[in-house]
């Protein structure tokens, strides 16, 4: 299971960016940096495949970026991941 802590969000060129700590099974495994500049987030390459597999378990079989954004949004909005997955599915169709 993945989660994030210490989320700091900010306005980037192409939306809201963030920096956070990524945890897998309650162990910090990476610091993620998404500057909302259209590029790939720093710090997730090593965990991309695992994030995609985790996405399947929560019903969100999309890219690691979308799955990570969903996790961050659930933490920032203080809602269960299942609630945020339902919101993402509405948007993603």
Predicted regions and their residues:
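Terminal leader/tail segments of proteins
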Residues: 1-93
């Amino acid at each position: 299971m993945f989660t994030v802590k210490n989320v700091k969000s900010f306005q980037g060129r192409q939306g809201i960016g963030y920096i956070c700590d990524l945890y897998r099974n309650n162990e910090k495994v990476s610091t993620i940096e998404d500057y909302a500049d259209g590029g790939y987030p720093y710090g997730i390459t090593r965990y991309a495949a695992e994030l995609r597999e985790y996405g399947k378990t929560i019903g969100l079989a999309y890219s690691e970026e979308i799955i990570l954004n969903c996790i961050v949004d659930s933490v920032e909005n203080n809602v269960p991941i299942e609630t945020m997955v339902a919101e993402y599915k509405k948007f993603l169709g």
